[in-house]
Amino acid sequence: MKKILVTGGCGYIGSHTIVDLLENGFEVISVDDNSRSTTYAMGAIEQLTGKKIRNYTVDLKNYDATHNIFSENKDITGIIHFAAFKAVGESCEFPMKYYENNLFSLINLLKCVQEFNIPHFVFSSSCTVYGNPDSIPVTEAFPVKKAESPYGATKQMGETILQDFSKVNSTSSILLRYFNPVGAHPSILLGEVPLGKPMNLVPAITQTAIGKLPKMFVWGSDYPTRDGSCIRDYIHVCDIANAHTLALQYLIEKRNSTNCDVFNLGSGDGVSVLEAIKMFEAVSGVSLNYEIGPRRSGDVVAIYANNDFAVKTLGWKPKYGLNEMMDTAWKWELKLKNEKIGV
C-alpha cells in the first residue's frame, strides 16, 4: 500500500481527496495547520471510510517542523499539495501574506522532496494562471498571461518553481489547473466548513439562502457576457478529488509524457453567476436576496475549460452536473445549521 502525504488535508478539496485516495487503496497522512480549516473533516473521513487519518498540525512555512514529518515517514510515495490561501479578493488586499504563505510552503516541501527522494508530486494549481484568456474554452496549451490577482500570481510562480525543480530532479510532477470546485460529498457527511465570510460564490449563495447572510452581492453586471455577470466553470468537488487519485496512479504507472505534465480540471461548461443563482433557486426552492454590486478587483471576465486532455489521458470523467453540485451544497448547508458544525 503506497503512502501519500496530503497537505491541507483538513480543507475542502483535501478532505474529499483523502476519501477518494482511501477508497482506491492508498494509505494517507495529512498535514494542516488548521488556520483556515477545522479538524471536523478528520472525523468525517473516518466515518465515511472506517479509517483514522493522522494529521500533523504543522505550518509548512516552518521548515524544521515540515522536515520532521518526512523524517517520521520515510516511505512516502507521493505528495498532493493543496495547502494554500485561495481568496482572490483577499489576495488583492494582502498580497504579501499570499506570496509568503503560498510560496514558502511549496519551497519547504520541495526541499524535503529532494532530500528524501519522494518520487511523485501533484500540485494544486488554478485556472487563474490563464488570466483573462483571449478565447474560451482554454486548453493546457494556452499562454499563461499576467495574473489578475496576487493569488493567481502565486499559482503561476508555484508552477514555474515546480517545472524548474522537475528539470533537475527525478521527481515526476503534475500540475492540476482546476476551475471552481463546489458541492459536497453525496453522503452529506463531508463538505466545506466555513470560517469567516464566504470568499466564493456557492457558499455565499447557500449562506444567504439559509439566513446566515442577509443578502449576497453579484459583483458586476456590465461584463461582455450573455447576461452581464462573470462566467465560470463549476466542477463538483468529488470529481476534482477523483482526478487527483487518477493523477497519482498515472505517475506511479510511469505513463507521464514529461517530468511535469499539466491538466485542466473543469466541467467544460461556462455558467454565469446569475445562471448559477437561478439553478440554486430551482434546486432548493429558495428565492435568493441578492444585489448587483460593482466589479470586484482581480475577477476574470469569463473562463471555462477544455478538459479533453484529462479525460483522454487520465481516464477522468466528471460525473456530477450543476444541479447536483447545488443540491449537495444546499443539503450540506442545512446540515451545518442543524448540527452547528463550524460554529
Language-model regions, residue ranges each:
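N-terminal Rossmann-like NAD(P)+-binding domain of SDR-like oxidoreductases, especially those catalyzing
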Residues: M1-A184
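Short glycine- and Lys/Arg-enriched binding-loop motifs that mark or flank ligand-binding interfaces
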Residues: I4-C10, C127, E148, F179, ...
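Short, flexible, glycine-rich and Lys/Arg-enriched loop motifs at helix boundaries
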Residues: T39, N180-N200, G211-R232
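C-terminal substrate-binding subdomain of Rossmann-fold SDR/epimerase-dehydratase oxidoreductases
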Residues: V58, A204-V343
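Short regulatory "switch" loops immediately downstream of catalytic or recognition motifs
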Residues: T66, G183-P186, A247-K254
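Short-chain dehydrogenase/reductase
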Residues: Y99, E148-Q156, G191, L195-M199, ...
